[in-house]
Amino acid sequence: MSNKKIEQWEVERYWEIFSSLAGGQPHLNNSQAASVLRNSRLRDDQLEKVWDLADLDGDGELDFEEFCVAMRLVFDLVNGELPQVPKSLPDWLVPESKAHLVQATRALSGGQEQFERIEDEDSTPGLKDGFDWYMSPEDKAKYEEIYSANKNQRGEIAFGSLEPLYESLDVPDTDIRSAWNLVNPSAAPEINKDATLAFLHILNYRHEGYRIPRTIPASLRASFENNKIDYQLDSARPAQKWGTNGDTETSTGRKAKFGDTYLSRLGVAGKTSYTPKGTDFSDTIQDEEWEKVRLRRELAELDAKLQAANKAVEGRKAGNRNDGRPNWVLIKKEALQLLEYKERELRELREGSGRAKAGGDVERLREDVRTVGEQVDGLKNHLIQRKGVLEDLRREIEDERASR
């Protein structure tokens, strides 16, 4: 398995570029992204293929995750990591939130598993009869948690999206596929919510040692198509309602309850040890933008405090006015102007305009970005020093008041 991934520093850099181009919008259209992508000097036909691969949802625009995919492909092509644009995205480059789209695309292109229907001559020893279609409120809530954690944008579930759940169950693969075929008579690549809940209910009973039913009630089968399902079947027998009594032991006393292990791995049941495959953009550095907002707010607050302090100083006696102290308001104003200049310079570097437009030397651009970053850090340190000066002014004001 490849250990490649998009590093955090790459995500940060891509966010800077994306946010400068998007103008506060969540997507980039073709014309907005063209200026950055064409700076790579790749051929137009290569860029078209990169765009098609990165546009995972096929809406003709790139959100931030898709933009990261496009930028990584471009850099790998420019740096020789890829000899040509791949025909499909490698798994490590697929964003976790869009894995279902890639899976659906592969299924539609011919990669969808076609499960052989297994005739119901169940010879497995030790299985019990008495499957009940009734879903208790506790079971239904658990099924809905699993459904919500795996559904795609259309609210549907693919067979492969529940692989981690299958691994946690004491259910043979052939029975899992039989249950899928039972709730999916049209052999569609995905099923809706009602069919998913029925599928999970069948797996639940099989996990507890009951035989999989051979047929689905006609009314229930119709509900898969009408998107309406009755979970309180009149034919339910209370003695067979799994989970309705206080006994929390399973049929064997050793197996975990259906879905508990899986939900714990997902973090739904209070644990967060589950780590899905693919590129995780959940820690996308939009914090940098928020850091700018916080910094500007702190600067504004500091400016207001400085103005208040200066007004207090102006109220002192004439003999204490001209004591040779520096004009901190002027210094603060100059520091803000310098910060705005450096931010504008950084923005020009991101957009490929200004000085960066004259050349395509990536190393030089990286050095410029690092230099600007160091200068911004210097301004932050300067801000800290000014805060110290403000505290000194406050102490002087308090001392002056105390001496009166």
Curated annotation (Swiss-Prot):
One of its GO terms (biological process) is endocytosis. This is Actin cytoskeleton-regulatory complex protein end3. Ca(2+) binds at D55, D57, D59, E61, E66. Pfam families: EH, End3. Keywords: Actin-binding, Calcium, Cell membrane, Coiled coil, Cytoplasm, Cytoskeleton, Endocytosis, Endosome, Membrane, Metal-binding, Repeat. It comes from Emericella nidulans (strain FGSC A4 / ATCC 38163 / CBS 112.46 / NRRL 194 / M139) (Aspergillus nidulans). Residues 280-399 form a coiled coil. The keyword Membrane applies. Belongs to the END3 family. Component of the PAN1 actin cytoskeleton-regulatory complex. GO terms for cellular component: actin cortical patch; cytoplasm; endosome membrane; plasma membrane. Residues 42-77 form the EF-hand domain. It comes from the Eukaryota. It is a peripheral membrane protein. SUPFAM superfamilies: EF-hand (SSF47473). One of its GO terms (molecular function) is actin binding. Component of the PAN1 actin cytoskeleton-regulatory complex required for the internalization of endosomes during actin-coupled endocytosis. The complex links the site of endocytosis to the cell membrane-associated actin cytoskeleton. Mediates uptake of external molecules and vacuolar degradation of plasma membrane proteins. Plays a role in the proper organization of the cell membrane-associated actin cytoskeleton and promotes its destabilization. InterPro entries: EF-hand-dom_pair, EF_Hand_1_Ca_BS, EF_hand_dom, EH_dom, End3. It is found in: Cell membrane; Endosome membrane; Cytoplasm, Cytoskeleton, Actin patch. Residues 10-100, 139-227 form the EH domain.
